[in-house]
Amino acid sequence: MEEFQVYLELNRSRRHDFLYPLIFREYIYALAHEHGLNKSMIFFENQGYGNKFSSLIVKRLILRMDQQNRLISSANDSNQNPVFGHNNNLYSQMIAVGFAVIVEIPFSLRLISYSQGAEVAKSHNLQSIHSIFPFLEDKFSHLNYVLEALIPHPIHLEILVQALRYWVKDASSLHLLRFSLYEYCNLKSFITPKKSISIFNPRLFLFLYNSHTCEYESIFLFLRNQSSHLRSTSSGVFLERIFFYGKIKYLGEVFYNDFQNNLWLFKDPFIHFIRYQGKSILASKDTSLLINKWKYYFVDLWQYYFYLWSQSGRVRINQLSKYSLDFLGYLSSVRLNPSVVRSQMLENSFLIDNAVKTLDTRIPIISLIGSLSKAKFCNTLGHPISKPTWADSPDSDIIDRFVRISRNLSHYHSGSSKKKSLYRIKYILRFSCVKTLARKHKSTVRAFLKKLGSEFLEEFFTETEEEHVFSLIFPRGFFAMRKVYRGRIWYLDIICINALVNHS
């Protein structure tokens, strides 16, 4: 029992984080501004403070929040406060900006301490989105079933605030956060309005949501490690691809006795868990009975331990050989590649049928064309159209934008098993560029191409980056070169999915 208590208890040193005094430090807000932690920064230009955050304003604001009878009480959030010259929404955003920076300090320090160890070289590659696909190639081809679960969103902000009680010890910071949420977000019901979230700092909401998700994942990993025949090794830190700073192997005050009677339900030595944003994926080699037990475990865990309503329909179970997993811009499935081997023993020869399982990654061409259609590069059928909003730009800028989008898509989808869909996307972008230029010069597409020649826009058909790299290694006439071109290539430098359009 002592062994489980050591595993379950939080590290005491991590709970001695008194964050409330940092709210009154002006350099916290300067740090948020200088490092660009929030794109929609708020500046206070009155009272002679200049374009900067002032700790004096923060002190006055917090003191004013504690008073029951405030000087100004307005039913309309758009009315300005004559004391500061800004509305109440700006106050909530100001507190959120500072608090978002402050609560991330303990995680940043812990991440720095881990980076000084020997595991940092192994963890760097986990920052790339593509790092998950080599793992899928190695593991998923041997598995049978996959469970997809949409993580339910907290229906009340109090759940998100309570998720921080394991990381932040002083109650003043939590009370201030709770008060600002209820005071300025105007939460009158258990269902959070979308408008209330939009006025609050999205970075802080993202941090609170990831803290809540990390808590239930820690319980899941604990049960998985205790039930598995082959204990998985818990790493000190796991770099989330985009949003979260770290995952720690310790979890909150959960008692082992509550779970030990149920561990026998989940015996499975081959089980893998992946989460990205709001989706969790659980893959198993065992029978459908076991994966169904995990399904009801997820639903019960969310409802009874985290008070989140989750319907069983949000958790789907599929067989990998008959289902394509829509994940991170790829349709992944397990494909059987049949092969026939001729064997001869003495004078007798016979044929042996052998099927090899491989991971097949394809581009979701329909959804990708839908994204291009929303960005006004083509219609819903995939026919290229002009981009009128870019027609006022210089020709070089128009070509550069289209070429950059084409190369970004080619770079990200370089791991596709079939490249024909990618060639169709390049075709759409190329002729959308031509139609945009023809629209600008008030000409037809045929006349415009005839005037500039066939060498125009050759950037769209130049060799890709991976082809250029391998051309420096292998001779052009080498036979293996063609196989290399058709192979999947995963890059470990992609840390985010680039938007199709960077400029409006």
Curated annotation (Swiss-Prot):
<dbReference type="Pfam" id="PF01824">
    <property type="entry name" value="MatK_N"/>
</dbReference>
<dbReference type="GO" id="GO:0008380">
    <property type="term" value="P:RNA splicing"/>
</dbReference>
<dbReference type="InterPro" id="IPR002866">
    <property type="entry name" value="Maturase_MatK"/>
</dbReference>
<dbReference type="GO" id="GO:0003723">
    <property type="term" value="F:RNA binding"/>
</dbReference>
<dbReference type="Pfam" id="PF01348">
    <property type="entry name" value="Intron_maturas2"/>
</dbReference>
<dbReference type="InterPro" id="IPR024937">
    <property type="entry name" value="Domain_X"/>
</dbReference>
<keyword id="KW-0694">RNA-binding</keyword>
<keyword id="KW-0150">Chloroplast</keyword>
<dbReference type="InterPro" id="IPR024942">
    <property type="entry name" value="Maturase_MatK_N"/>
</dbReference>
<keyword id="KW-0934">Plastid</keyword>
<protein>
    <recommendedName>
        <fullName>Maturase K</fullName>
    </recommendedName>
</protein>
<dbReference type="GO" id="GO:0008033">
    <property type="term" value="P:tRNA processing"/>
</dbReference>
<dbReference type="GO" id="GO:0006397">
    <property type="term" value="P:mRNA processing"/>
</dbReference>
<comment type="function">
    <text>Usually encoded in the trnK tRNA gene intron. Probably assists in splicing its own and other chloroplast group II introns.</text>
</comment>
<keyword id="KW-0507">mRNA processing</keyword>
<comment type="similarity">
    <text>Belongs to the intron maturase 2 family. MatK subfamily.</text>
</comment>
<keyword id="KW-0819">tRNA processing</keyword>
<dbReference type="GO" id="GO:0009507">
    <property type="term" value="C:chloroplast"/>
</dbReference>
